[in-house]
């Protein structure tokens, strides 16, 4: 079921009830002009099929754009194929994902809404589907519920991951996306783990 925002209506200038006079004004973010300041944060739907954009995903984000949101940040989008965060999440780790993203971006753009892809590497938070190799992390520390400890990611692997993030961002651009957000929050996934003293016990330049 699509969810719109029927309450997104501009109030008259000087209206004493309007406590946020700039909410519906455009805002400049880098090279992008967003039509208003109502942003949709990343919210997982798990509507992808084998990491590919589906019609359900297009309808989901299209409904929010149609409702008046100025900018949408997508749910997590993985940058490499080895580790899957959750079944039903999206990826853009090779060019085969670009056509689906082109359709998604076109759907959102027809309503004047911008869309960013939230790029992510799940690392020690990856879903342990059969065949998944040992999970990686900044160091040997994993979440409390893990059945086995992850292995520390190597410096060589980190160089590859940097390239994979860059290549994923380029694919988003090719598909018509307006930018990317890098998920590095609350010790969640690889980059968030590097920023947390609970998970990052390294003694090298990455510690």
Which residue stretches match the model-derived regions?
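Flavin-dependent oxidoreductase catalytic cores
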Residues: 5-207
């Amino acid at each position: 079921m699509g969810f719109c925002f029927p309450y997104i209506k501009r109030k008259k200038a000087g209206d004493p009830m309007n406590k946020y006079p700039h909410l519906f004004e455009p805002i400049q973010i880098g090279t992008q002009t967003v039509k208003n300041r109502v942003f949709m944060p990343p919210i997982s739907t798990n509507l992808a099929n084998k990491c590919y954009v589906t019609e359900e995903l297009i309808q989901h984000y299209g409904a929010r754009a149609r409702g008046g949101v100025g900018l949408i940040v997508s749910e997590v989008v993985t940058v490499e194929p080895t580790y899957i965060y959750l079944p039903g999440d999206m990826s853009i780790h090779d060019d085969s994902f670009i056509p689906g993203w082109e359709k998604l971006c076109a759907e959102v753009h027809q309503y004047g809404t911008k869309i960013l892809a939230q790029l992510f590497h799940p690392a020690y938070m990856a879903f342990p589907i059969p065949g998944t190799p040992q999970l990686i992390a900044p160091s040997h520390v994993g979440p409390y519920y893990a059945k086995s400890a992850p292995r520390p990611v190597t410096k060589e692997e980190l160089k590859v991951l940097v390239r994979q993030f860059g290549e994923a961002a380029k694919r988003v651009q090719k598909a018509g996306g307006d930018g990317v957000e890098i998920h590095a929050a609350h010790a969640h996934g690889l980059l968030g783990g590097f920023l947390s003293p609970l998970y990052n016990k390294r003694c090298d330049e990455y510690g």
